Amino acid sequence: MNEIGLSLDTVWMLLAAMLVFWMQPGFALCEAGFTRSKNTANILMKNFVDFMFGSLLFFFLGFGFMFGSEGAGFIGMPNWGDLSFYKGDLPVEGFLIFETVFCATSATIVSGAMAERTKFSMYVIYSAAISLFIYPIEGHWTWGGGWLCNDAADSFMMSTFGDVFHDFAGSAIVHSVGGVLALIGAIALGPRVGKYDEKGNSKAIPGHSLTLASLGVFILWLGWFGFNPGSQLAASGEVNRIAISHVFLTTNLAAAAGGVATMFLTWLKYGKPSLSLTLNGVLAGLVGITAGCDLVSPWGAVIIGLVCGIVLVYAIEFIDHKLHIDDPVGASSVHGVCGILGTIMTGLLSVSNGAFYGHGWGFFGAECFGVLVIDLWAAACGVVLFFGIKKLHGLRVDKRIEEEGLDVYEHGEMCYN
């Protein structure tokens, strides 16, 4: 590769990393807006924890666990902060930063589902565990060259499905993992005080600022233009410039379709279009398209967005009203359900090897198997982590602290005075 092309690719990767980093304040504002004002400082602090601890731990060990060895292994070799093992064309420091912001995204998804009742000290522990072990290990199976993406003729995936698992930017690897962990964490915590009456009926606990939540979603939408197109990791040459342009388009179309689908469904279902659910509908479309944004057509992206936007509404209702799991921001539905759904639909709608384009069911099977394995890993880790913390030290704050707000009791300060 010539120097100019490699330099352009490096600059694009770093710009994309900056956009993905910008998703952190997007998540922070979205979560803060969907929760009550007495917990805002706690929400913001947890989002800082995700990136601060994630940056250090992923540099020290997580990067090695994810990329430290090639082949069909379970986990890469630890690097202990030594980056010399990496042999790619792009500068290793830049690639590390790009992967770090993805790792932090997976960790921060969990925060919203466990909002308003989690001990801050325990949040630090499980945020660190996600960045150090949970995300890097399943990341090694996929983006790290592990067994789910091993395309050797005699590999398990090729001999079983005739194709490998594909997740271009992380519908499963990042989002469904975060969503499954969020669901397990919310189950371990239990619902907020006053969320369900004595008959088990769900009672709405409105957030304090749809303005903040709306701004957060707009910022996330912007950040996704680094999250998905940036995963091409190149911008030089005709192939790459066409690829990132295509991914930009499919990403935007899915987001718009998800929001439109949710808006009209809530209008029909509840008599009025819901802003809060429409915001989550946009995110549902973004999460859903992330796996196959490089493989599906623009119309395929619209279909994925529409389906995710519709399914989102029923998923939130089912988790809240039927399962009685209290997820204040809908993270388990947006990232978990729609991450899984988007990955599966990639197996159907991929132009190059999807079942609906006459290429057989092998790739669809690979997508279903891959997301199943990844999320079973996340669920198993979540059960051990959250229920282990709950038994050993306690995961939840006292009732009085929850009722009066975590800001003062956990941090000694409030966002609003």
Roles of regions detected by a PLM:
Residues 1-417:
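Glycine- and aromatic-enriched membrane alpha-helices
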